[in-house]
A protein has these predicted regions:
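Conserved structured core elements
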Residues: 15, 157-158
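Anionic group-transfer/hydrolysis microenvironments
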Residues: 13-15, 69, 164
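ATPase catalytic-site recognition across NTP-hydrolyzing enzymes
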Residues: 1-12, 17
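Short beta-strand scaffold segments in enzyme catalytic cores
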Residues: 19-25, 165
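Residue-level detector of short, conserved catalytic/binding motifs and their immediate flanks
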Residues: 19, 62, 161
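Mg2+-dependent endonuclease catalytic cores in nucleic-acid-processing enzymes, primarily RNase H-like
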Residues: 28-153, 172-189, 196-207
Length: 207
C-alpha cells in the first residue's frame, strides 16, 4: 500500500501503436516505486485520457510527464496532443527529451545501493503488476551507432522504458518530511532565535 502522503507522478509514452503509462510514488528517502501500469494499443486520446483518469481515481498527482512530441500540432485538428489531453482533464508536463542524458539518469536510479534498512536495493523499485515494464526493460539493447543510446527497434520494446525515461528526466522530488514544529502567523509570536551559526541554521530550517 502506497501512503497517501507520498508524492505521486504519472509518466506516459503515447501513440496509437501503444500507450504505456506508469504511476510512480516517491517516498521520504527519495526511493521511487512504480506501482501501476497501463499498457494498451489503439487508444485515441479521449479513450486514453478516460482510462488514465479512471485508474488515477482520487489520487493527487504532482505532475503528468510526457514526451515533447505531444506538443506538436496535429494536421487533422490543428491542435497538439497535449492540448487534446488537456481538454479531457489531463494537464501534461513536457519531459526532457535528451535521450542519452535520460538513459544516464535511469541507470543512476537502477544502480545498486542500500535501502533504509541497509539492505541491497535500487532507488527505483517496480511492483510485480507492471508486467510489461518488467518484460521490456531488460530486453532494451544499445544502439549500434551510438552505444550511449538505446536501440529504437524492436519498437514494441521501447514504449515502457521511454515512459520511465521521461519520469527520471523530470527530476522527481522526494516527499517532503512533515514539519511538526509549531508555525506562527506573525513574526512577533515566533520564539527568539539564538545568535551565532547555530541560530542561523535553525532559522533556515523554520522556513
Amino acid at each position: 500500500m502506497i501512503p497517501k502522503t507520498w508524492r505521486r507522478y504519472l509518466t506516459l509514452d503515447y501513440g496509437l501503436d501503444m500507450l504505456a503509462a506508469y504511476w510512480i510514488a516517491v517516498d521520504l528517502q527519495g526511493f521511487a516505486y512504480v506501482y501501476r501500469e497501463l499498457y494498451e494499443k489503439d487508444l485515441i486520446i479521449s479513450e486514453a485520457a478516460e482510462k488514465l483518469l479512471a485508474m488515477t481515481g482520487e489520487e493527487e498527482l504532482c505532475r503528468i510527464l510526457a514526451p515533447p512530441d505531444l506538443w506538436n500540432r496535429r494536421q487533422d485538428s490543428g491542435k497538439s496532443a497535449a492540448a487534446l489531453f488537456y481538454e479531457q482533464g489531463l494537464r501534461l508536463t513536457r519531459a526532457g527529451n535528451d535521450r542519452v542524458q535520460g538513459w544516464y539518469a535511469l541507470k543512476e536510479w537502477l544502480k545498486p545501493c542500500r535501502d533504509e534498512w541497509g539492505r541491497p536495493a535500487a532507488k527505483l523499485r517496480i511492483f510485480p503488476n507492471c508486467k510489461n515494464l518488467i518484460r521490456t526493460l531488460p530486453q532494451l539493447c544499445h544502439d549500434e551507432k551510438n552505444p550511449n543510446d538505446a536501440a529504437q527497434s524492436p519498437h514494441e520494446l521501447t514504449h515502457a522504458p521511454d515512459a520511465l525515461r521521461y519520469f527520471v528526466s523530470g527530476r522527481p522530488q522526494e516527499t517532503a518530511r512533515p514539519d511538526r514544529r509549531p508555525r506562527f502567523e506573525f513574526d512577533s509570536l515566533r520564539p527568539k532565535e539564538p545568535e551565532g551559526a547555530l541560530g542561523l541554521l535553525q532559522r533556515q530550517e523554520v522556513f
